[in-house]
């Protein structure tokens, strides 16, 4: 229930109530949760924060179209490993020198889900860089990488309320990491 008096106030910039609610929902500390103005904002802030070396960031050649937009905007070098003939991410293509990794799971626009064993292979081979798993469509199928947070401090899972919850207008995006 909203008090009409609150409409005149600016929102809490830290989104404290939302952060605490998300932390409680996922069983993590509120220090592990970052909230942004939609997942695009969260991904952009993550690019600025974590992808700042001269090494290329890796993301699939067929994938969410804003990854290269953010990389170009922020002058971050990147490479786009090709999907296989069935539109699968090939984990071995992400086992090379890089400045970070980001991929959607399930992939957008292909809808192909990368099994957690393969996500784990990518994480194991890249312990010195941040690996962002963009789970905008995870509620439509597959297991979340959130179950891997206790094992990998280099994992950042990004989610949104825009897709499966049909709340795009609220602009709620968030990241959970170690």
Question: Where are each of the predicted segments found?
Answer:
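N-terminal small-domain helix-loop-helix segment of the aminotransferase-like
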Residues: 1-40, 45
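Short glycine-rich anion-binding loops that position phosphate/pyrophosphate groups of nucleotides
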Residues: 39-40, 64, 105-110, 163
